[in-house]
Amino acid sequence: MADTCFRLHTEFEPTGDQPEAIGQIVANLGQGVRDQVLLGVTGSGKTFTVANVIAACNRPALILAPNKTLAAQLYNEFRALFPDNAVEYFVSYYDYYQPEAYVPASDTYIEKDSSINDNIDKLRHAATHALLTRRDVVIVASVSCIYGLGSPEYYARLVIPVECGQRFSMDALMTRLVEVQYQRNDFDFHRGTFRVRGDVLEVIPAYHHERALRIEFFGDDIDAISEIDPLTGEVLGSVGKTVIYPASHYVSDRDNLVRAMSDIRDELGERLREYQSANRLVEAQRLEQRTMLDLEMMEELGYCNGIENYSRHLDGRAAGQPPSCLLDYFPDDFLLFVDESHITVPQVGAMYKGDRSRKSTLVDFGFRLPSALDNRPLEFAEFLTRINQTVYVSATPGKWELDRSQGVIAEQIIRPTGLVDPVVEVRPTRGQVDDLLAECRARAARDERVLITTLTKRMAEDLTEHLGNMGLSVRYLHSDIDTMERMAIIQALRRGECDVLVGINLLREGLDIPEVSLVSILDADKEGFLRSTGSLIQTFGRAARNAAGRVILYADTVTASMRAAMDETARRRERQQAWNEANGIEPRTIRKSLDTPFDAIYSAASEGGKGRGRGRGRQAAPAVENVAEYGTSPEDMAKHIQKLEREMREAAKELEFERAATLRDRIRLLRERLIEA
């Protein structure tokens, strides 16, 4: 395993509270402190602080984010700070996911349906590959990192080392490749496949798009190994020896598979006896039919659809024992940074119960064996046993993190940019819509943006319609909008294609929009989750990246949460102003690129192989996409992509595969245009 040092590339030096926070965290880690909090306000450079801590400690790190959007944003930033090190991205690879489920009340079985994002799958493989081959690794992950992934021991054991001069016949290598889930395809050469031409075998590893390995044989010996461009065949360089990692994280050798299949049959027999003794013959027949079909597929192909449901048997685990996950791929001394910990920690704790509830019904009614319950996310207690030293990062850390850290807190209140927390003003609810309309018009005239939060979906919809009727360009952000469309709407706001964004619970953490100079909170005096002290402080922070930032609370009374949030904001504002005066700094609005956080994801997935997709370029895609049918705005393009995805899935269900392939290629082309837009 390569032991390379982290090298931080930046023209900036730590300033403000950053040097003290970095020194305090590094010292605590050196003294073995297990849990601590980095309490940093919006715009104070928490990511820069974390990067400096990683570089100083020189240990592998996991950055845990609460959603894909924030994970992509962090991945982008860490790649820029550590260009010479392995910064990888690990989130759910599903573009669309409908889990398997059963509704007893209506006797409705819902089959699993999903669409896997090939780019994200490649990046997941790149993440585990990096962890097994080097130590200078930063993985930015979502809560997907606590879901079952397959044993790292089996994964590492089944690698295929190849070396020039090695006695290794082509037939033996092809057999090994098939065992670790590579597929032979002499016509459609893409990631996870290999092809053979005479005495030459070429393979694209699961963690690459842009490079393939060419292995040349002389008899039963490996004569030469080269890296090639999979599209053009151009030789990029010679390789003395290399290692090919499995194409799936759920791999197993033949002996282990035979043992697992025997265990599955034993469990099936036991479960069938239970059903028969309870006279549940329908469930018994259903389970036997489904399980035997899976076993036949495993016997013939080495895997089956939904093989992860048998992961307990494949791993040789006891009933109830937690599965392996990404955390098990890290060395024991890794560092964990939990971003937006007040959201992420409860999210980690909630995953197990939701998954268990759905699968218990499938098991009870004979759709799955009881062992399927052990293909699950970690319980919170299991998560805690797998993590090492942890830094919880938030502007509003939760009670659990504060208790866990026992008062070990590094505060980061000063913003190096000099930006102060926004002025907070309380106004009465009487006439609030007209007052808000005037404020929005004033901001639009200055080419500034406005965020408005409401308590209900109905109110958000009505307000959006009213403001639109009054001549403002306004968009509505709600929970039904997927990640890509949400980013398109935010980009439209930043570009000035709309002036106002209305939402409910989506305008808090992680929205980095420097163009926003006004945040307006309606019904601010309605105590509850959306109007708690932490929620209010987070929402205030959306106006903290603009020198003219201001917050208006519409309320008839000042609640305890409002008072606490305003007092804390005032404290931070005063401290920043004092620092600015002492250092002669004039606050200036942040200037930020209009690139989306996902730009780095797609560029990383196709780096060095622009336009190659799955190794075929854009040959099957239409030469020109008719933009007139959906418009040119990012929001319209995102909606059109969703429409095409629905049509693609419908075509696949109807076995119209050529049409589905054409739609798929149109979607790829549109996604590229959306990123470039």
From Swiss-Prot:
Which amino acid positions bind ATP, per UniProt?
G40, V41, T42, G43, S44, G45, K46, T47
Similarity remark: Belongs to the UvrB family.
Report the function annotation for this chain. Answer: The UvrABC repair system catalyzes the recognition and processing of DNA lesions. A damage recognition complex composed of 2 UvrA and 2 UvrB subunits scans DNA for abnormalities. Upon binding of the UvrA(2)B(2) complex to a putative damaged site, the DNA wraps around one UvrB monomer. DNA wrap is dependent on ATP binding by UvrB and probably causes local melting of the DNA helix, facilitating insertion of UvrB beta-hairpin between the DNA strands. Then UvrB probes one DNA strand for the presence of a lesion.
- All residue ranges annotated as the Helicase C-terminal domain in the record: 432-594
Q: Does the keyword Nucleotide-binding apply?
A: yes
**PROSITE patterns found in the cross-reference section:** HELICASE_ATP_BIND_1, HELICASE_CTER, UVR
SUPFAM superfamilies reported for this sequence: C-terminal UvrC-binding domain of UvrB, P-loop containing nucleoside triphosphate hydrolases
What name does UniProt use for this protein? UvrABC system protein B
What CDD domains does the entry give? Answer: DEXHc_UvrB (cd17916), SF2_C_UvrB (cd18790)
Q: Where in the cell is it found?
A: Cytoplasm
Q: Start and end of every Helicase ATP-binding domain?
A: 27-192
Could you tell me the superkingdom of the organism this chain comes from?
A: Bacteria
How would you summarize the oligomeric state and partners of this protein?
Answer: Forms a heterotetramer with UvrA during the search for lesions. Interacts with UvrC in an incision complex.
Q: Tell whether Cytoplasm is among the UniProt keywords.
A: yes
Supply the gene name: uvrB
Species assigned in the record:
Nitratidesulfovibrio vulgaris (strain DP4)
**Sequence motif Beta-hairpin, residues:** 93-116
Q: Which GO terms describe its molecular function?
A: ATP binding; ATP hydrolysis activity; DNA binding; excinuclease ABC activity; helicase activity
Domain UVR, first and last residues per copy: 638-673
Taxonomic path:
Bacteria, Pseudomonadati, Thermodesulfobacteriota, Desulfovibrionia, Desulfovibrionales
Q: State a GO cellular component annotated for this protein.
A: excinuclease repair complex
Q: Which NCBIfam families match?
A: PRK05298.1 (NF003673), uvrb (TIGR00631)
What GO biological process, any one, is recorded here? nucleotide-excision repair
Q: What is known of its domains?
A: The beta-hairpin motif is involved in DNA binding.
Q: Which HAMAP family match?
A: UvrB
Keyword tags: ATP-binding, Cytoplasm, DNA damage, DNA excision, DNA repair, Excision nuclease, Helicase, Hydrolase, Nucleotide-binding, SOS response
